[in-house]
Swiss-Prot record:
TM helices/strands, residue ranges: none
GO CC field: cytosol
Reactions the enzyme catalyzes: UDP-N-acetyl-alpha-D-muramate + NADP(+) = UDP-N-acetyl-3-O-(1-carboxyvinyl)-alpha-D-glucosamine + NADPH + H(+)
Pfam families in UniProt: FAD_binding_4 (PF01565), MurB_C (PF02873)
Record gene name: murB
Protein's UniProt keywords contain Ribonucleoprotein: no
Protein name according to UniProt: UDP-N-acetylenolpyruvoylglucosamine reductase
Length: 284
């Protein structure tokens, strides 16, 4: 594989590349510098784990074999009311570019950590909006060819997309937005960020919401608090005292600590109200 296309690191600790600050070494950590480099890396390592910004990942303490990181694939440009981005671009930077160009539609996503690719993979959402609301098309690599799919082909639903049942790699995507007043966009974004800061442990290492919401009127954090688990700690992993839907790393948490907390929460919630919680965080 051409090193001009990719940077390659050996035995790279994944804790340096995940928002949880957890994870053992990747035997090979491959960082493509272009879409062509990404396709080249995928052709050499078709079974590699794909890592964007690492904000929704719990990596194992034992590490993994090969990781391909999209962090350097962050080009982004505006074409009238479309924003076209490579898959590694941060959602934060895309929201900022939208506001700077007076484009509305991504306000809900301001403050969601992670990459464009990860957001589409999970159909990320918050505050009444979802990524599927604004996706126009996605360019993907299926292991043999590059193809462009429009929104109707992506099988979006709550925290789901077609990419969770395929090995297709998201290369780039376009978001269809609308012209609006820049000040109104910025005000909406800042209001959402303030709400995040007030309600979520954004100053602590975590992977965001651990569990999917099982129903419109079911609030996971509230139930966890009701059954007395808020603040529960295993090793250096703790159910956040600020928002019980989050597990935070107090310093030296291990993946095994987090998994034990997840098991406790799921068991107690099932016992309390009969609901089997589904994970939103992705466990490698």
């Amino acid at each position: 594989m051409e090193r001009d296309f990719c940077e390659i690191k050996l035995d790279e600790p994944l804790k340096y590349h995940t928002s949880f600050k957890i994870g053992g070494p990747a035997r090979l950590f491959v960082v493509p510098n272009s879409i062509e480099g990404l396709i080249c890396a995928l052709s050499h390592f078709p079974d590699a784990k794909i890592l964007g910004r690492g904000t929704n990942i719990l990596a194992p303490d034992s590490g993994v074999d090969v990781v391909i990181s999209t962090v350097n694939l962050n080009k982004c440009f505006v074409d009238d009311e479309l924003i076209v981005c490579e898959s590694g671009a941060s959602l934060f930077s895309v929201c900022k570019k939208a506001s700077h160009n007076s484009l509305s539609g991504l306000e809900f996503a301001y403050g969601i950590p992670g990459s464009v690719g990860g957001a589409i993979y999970m159909n990320a959402g918050a505050y009444g909006g979802q990524i599927c609301d604004v996706v126009a098309w996605v360019e993907v690599y299926d292991g043999e060819k590059v193809m462009t799919l429009d929104r109707s082909q992506l099988e979006f639903s709550y925290r789901k997309s077609i990419f969770q049942r395929t090995r297709w790699m998201i290369l780039k995507a376009a978001f269809k937005l609308k012209k609006a007043d820049m000040n109104e966009i910025n005000n909406a974004m800042e209001e959402i960020m303030t709400r995040r800061m007030e309600s979520q442990p954004m100053d602590m290492p975590s992977a965001g919401s651990v569990f999917k919401k099982p129903g419109e009127d079911f609030y996971v954090a509230r139930v966890i608090e009701e059954i007395g688990l808020k603040g529960l700690r295993v090793g250096d992993a703790q159910i956040s005292t600020k928002h019980a839907g989050f597990i935070v790393n107090l310093g030296e948490a291990r993946s095994s600590d987090v998994l034990k907390l997840i098991e406790i929460i799921r068991h107690r919630v099932k016992e309390h109200c009969g609901i089997q919680l589904q994970l939103e965080v992705e466990i490698w």
